[in-house]
């Protein structure tokens, strides 16, 4: 039974919940459920897990009886189930609940519980999975007819506005919040193709996403990362609900891929698949060559070309000749009057001179002062330029970075103000989201980013801290669970002996090794050991928060990059600055737990579920494994973290080098031993980033890993990805790249949000100090010109949001028109 977006909760999961409620497990009795990890694994971002219904429908008899309140107290003496009621009776009942929502507090909660039971599909009155899915769709549609979702959201906004600072200490307020979050979950979980309904949810005021994020920040700050409270609080519901809101209002993974494909077709129209495409750098070189003869080509031309390897990184990398000049302007570079480059007077060989000339032509910024005289351009040159532009391989990120970099350059140098001030002012004050306004989904994503911008820094900081503390707690709980079972301890010891060349194999271990059974499904590396109900409940709740946060990070990175690349770079920078890389590496390593486990059970556990590969890959036939749903969550958590890590470090040499220095590659090698194709692929992609910065001895000793990277990862035909340039030059290039990109990110946000950036200064004090020091060092070494602090500093005083009007006033320019 595959997990789909339409089946928000599977029928089998409801049956397990009902079984749990009817016959609750003892506190110290092992909990065994038939997991659905294989079904859940089929859809990454839209998968649903065994504890999801336990998350939004508390597994206890009191809550269950409240869900059935309409049958006992308010059923108008009708002795029939919900499924057997007529459509008019259902509508009258929902209308009655709608009236009660606006009445006193005594009846409001009972009406909300009844609506929650209806929205959950009335699972105790249906007999099959198909009936359950149909019941959910029908009931939610009826609730929408009477605007029940909007009414519930208005109650949530009213409660959020009037809540006290210490509302978590009040069990009544916390229970009411859990009830409202559960209702919002069921209303947003059901997949709906009705554009009117989606538009109504997007147009709610205040918006849903920033409201939930602000509540998440308040709850996390109040709890102060007390994990004992997190387990029993509404924070786990809230974190998953934020992720679910992003899916429903932005789009799922499949919809994201369709949107990316559509944008690619728009940007590469009239291109031929039989002929090779040129790069953006080739087109810039062509424009420079033409501009030396025909100045009209220099009108809207970008002075800094893009690098061939990483097309959206600015400025170029690994070029010593580039470092000897500024990337914004330089008087010694070529011009239309004198297009020849400076010739080195030092005696060099013919081959080295030719190589130096080629490198200079490919990487030197072609900056020059355009000739204002209008010359006639031959038709053949214009036609060649159009064909070349159509054959140029471009991406949305390249176009956005080129545009933003041109604005920064023009405003920094104050060029063309006298010649054509009105045109320059319109370009600077143009539409903020010129690349995504044509698409309604990207426009809404941009609006969501605008709403989230004041809370983004604080939210990412608290979310990453919460991820760290929860992952550390989960590892400790797993070690405690290992230590609580003597039988499992013996099994681990036997399997640890299998990998040891010095110890003798037991009969059971030898027989298991001889069978050499291949693992095919996710259930085979489930954490199949007997644990108490208390530990199982804690692990399920904590892992659910880990899955929600990792999925949310991945979803935001993907959609923000599609809307604007600088939003993606800002989020990636926040994750990097809050040490997500180190936290993930520590979670895989977990030094203290590793030593304890190795001492007790002779098995080094690599974190998450990598220990399962050593535990169960030999004894699947002889000893039955108790499957648990958390194994699929662990699998998806790991893949999400690997994908987030790859996106954060993919375009930064400094971050790639940190991966190599942190010995993360040793933990990734352990993940390659787990027989799962997707997990191996994402682990290989992260390993590919760190390979150039690893030593030659490591490469020679791990040629099998490099071979797997060649076979599974998309690479160019050359082998340059395995090696990096000269160490000092690479570091200087990376430093220049990081500094310029940070300036560009800040310039973009200051241009759009103006005075709002002032409130973020307290979160960016250290960042601004480091950036200011880097700019001064690069300017002193003539690697770049000093950029005014008003263009990138959040602490710069601005009287109003009209930032550029103030800058024009400072230059004594009053009449823009």
Curated annotation (Swiss-Prot):
This is Factor arrest protein 11. Keywords: Cell cycle, Phosphoprotein, Vacuole. GO terms for cellular component: cytosol; FAR/SIN/STRIPAK complex; fungal-type vacuole; mitotic spindle pole body; nuclear envelope; old mitotic spindle pole body. GO terms for biological process: asymmetric protein localization to old mitotic spindle pole body; cytoskeleton organization; negative regulation of septation initiation signaling. It is found in: Vacuole. It holds the Pfam family DUF3402. It comes from Schizosaccharomyces pombe (strain 972 / ATCC 24843) (Fission yeast). The gene is far11. The modification Phosphoserine is found at residue 500. The keyword Glycoprotein does not apply. Belongs to the FAR11 family. Participates in the control of the reentry into the cell cycle following pheromone treatment. The modification Phosphothreonine is found at residue 502.
């Amino acid at each position: 039974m595959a997990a789909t977006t339409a089946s928000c909760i599977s029928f089998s999961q409801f049956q397990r919940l009902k079984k749990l409620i009817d016959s609750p497990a003892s506190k110290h009795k092992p909990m065994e459920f038939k997991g659905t990890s294989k079904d859940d694994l089929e859809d990454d971002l839209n998968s649903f897990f065994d504890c999801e219904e336990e998350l939004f429908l508390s597994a206890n008899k009191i809550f269950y009886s409240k869900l059935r309140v309409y049958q006992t107290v308010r059923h108008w003496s009708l002795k029939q189930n919900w499924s057997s009621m007529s459509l008019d009776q259902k509508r009258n009942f929902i209308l009655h609940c709608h009236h009660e929502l606006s009445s006193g507090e005594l009846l409001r909660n009972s009406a909300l519980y009844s609506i929650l039971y209806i929205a959950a599909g009335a699972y105790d009155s249906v007999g099959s999975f198909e009936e359950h899915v149909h019941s959910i769709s029908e009931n939610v549609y009826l609730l929408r007819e009477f605007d029940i979702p909007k009414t519930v959201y208005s109650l949530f906004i009213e409660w959020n506005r009037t809540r006290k600072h210490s509302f978590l200490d009040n069990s009544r307020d916390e229970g009411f919040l859990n009830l409202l979050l559960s209702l919002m979950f069921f209303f947003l979980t059901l997949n709906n193709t009705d554009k009117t309904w989606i538009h109504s949810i997007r147009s709610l005021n205040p918006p849903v996403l920033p409201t939930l994020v602000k509540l998440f920040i308040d709850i996390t700050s109040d709890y102060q990362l007390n994990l004992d409270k997190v387990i029993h609080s509404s924070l786990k519901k809230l974190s998953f609900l934020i992720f679910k809101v992003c899916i429903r209002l932005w789009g799922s993974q499949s919809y994201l891929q369709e949107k990316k494909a559509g944008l690619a077709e728009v940007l590469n129209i009239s291109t031929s698949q039989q002929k090779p495409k040129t790069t953006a750098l080739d087109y810039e070189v062509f424009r420079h060559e033409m501009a030396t003869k025909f100045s009209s080509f220099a009108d809207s031309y970008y002075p800094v070309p893009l690098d061939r390897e990483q097309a959206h990184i600015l400025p170029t990398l690994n070029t010593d000749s580039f470092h000897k000049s500024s990337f914004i302007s330089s008087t010694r570079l070529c011009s239309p009057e004198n297009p020849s480059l400076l010739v080195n007077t030092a005696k060099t060989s013919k081959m080295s001179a030719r190589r130096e000339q080629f490198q200079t032509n490919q990487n030197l910024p072609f900056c020059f002062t355009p000739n204002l005289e209008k010359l006639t351009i031959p038709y053949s040159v214009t036609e060649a330029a159009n064909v070349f532009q159509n054959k140029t391989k471009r991406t949305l990120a390249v176009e956005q970075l080129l545009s933003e970099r041109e604005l920064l350059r023009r405003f920094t140098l104050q060029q063309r103000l006298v010649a054509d001030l009105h045109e320059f002012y319109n370009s600077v004050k143009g539409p903020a989201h010129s690349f995504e306004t044509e698409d309604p989904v990207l426009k809404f994503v941009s609006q969501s980013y605008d709403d989230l911008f004041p809370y983004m820094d604080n939210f990412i900081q608290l979310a990453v801290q919460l991820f760290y503390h929860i992952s550390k707690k989960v590892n400790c709980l797993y070690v405690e669970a290992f230590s609580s079972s003597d039988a499992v301890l013996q099994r681990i010891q036997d399997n640890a002996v299998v990998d040891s060349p010095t110890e003798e194999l037991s009969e059971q271990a030898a027989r298991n090794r001889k069978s050499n059974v291949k693992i095919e499904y996710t259930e085979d590396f489930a954490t199949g050991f007997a644990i108490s109900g208390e530990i199982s409940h804690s692990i399920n709740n904590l892992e659910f928060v880990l899955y929600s946060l990792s999925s949310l990070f991945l979803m935001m990175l993907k959609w923000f990059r599609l809307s604007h690349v600088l939003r993606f770079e800002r989020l990636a920078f926040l994750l990097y600055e809050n040490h997500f890389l180190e936290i993930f590496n520590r979670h895989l390593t977990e030094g203290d737990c590793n030593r304890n486990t190795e001492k007790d059970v002779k098995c080094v556990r690599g974190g998450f579920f990598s220990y399962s590969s050593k535990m169960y890959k030999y004894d699947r036939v002889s000893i039955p494994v108790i499957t648990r749903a958390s194994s699929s969550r662990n699998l998806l958590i790991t893949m999400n973290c690997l994908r987030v890590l790859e996106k954060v470090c993919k375009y930064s040499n400094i971050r790639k080098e940190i991966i190599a220095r942190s010995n993360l590659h040793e933990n990734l090698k352990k993940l390659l031993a787990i027989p799962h194709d997707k997990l191996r692929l994402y682990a290989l992609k992260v390993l590919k980033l760190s390979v150039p910065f690893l030593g030659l001895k490591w490469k020679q000793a791990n040629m099998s890993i490099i071979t797997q990277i060649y076979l599974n990862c998309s690479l160019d035909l050359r082998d340059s990805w395995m090696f990096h340039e000269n160490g000092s030059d690479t570091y200087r290039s990376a430093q220049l790249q990081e500094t310029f990109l940070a300036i560009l990110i800040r310039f973009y946000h200051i241009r759009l949000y103006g005075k709002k950036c002032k409130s973020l200064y307290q979160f960016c004090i250290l960042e601004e100090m480091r950036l200011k020091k880097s700019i001064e060092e690069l300017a002193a070494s003539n690697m770049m010109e000093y950029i005014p602090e008003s263009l990138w500093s959040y602490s710069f005083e601005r009287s109003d949001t009209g930032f550029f009007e103030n800058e024009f006033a400072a230059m004594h320019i009053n009449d823009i028109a």
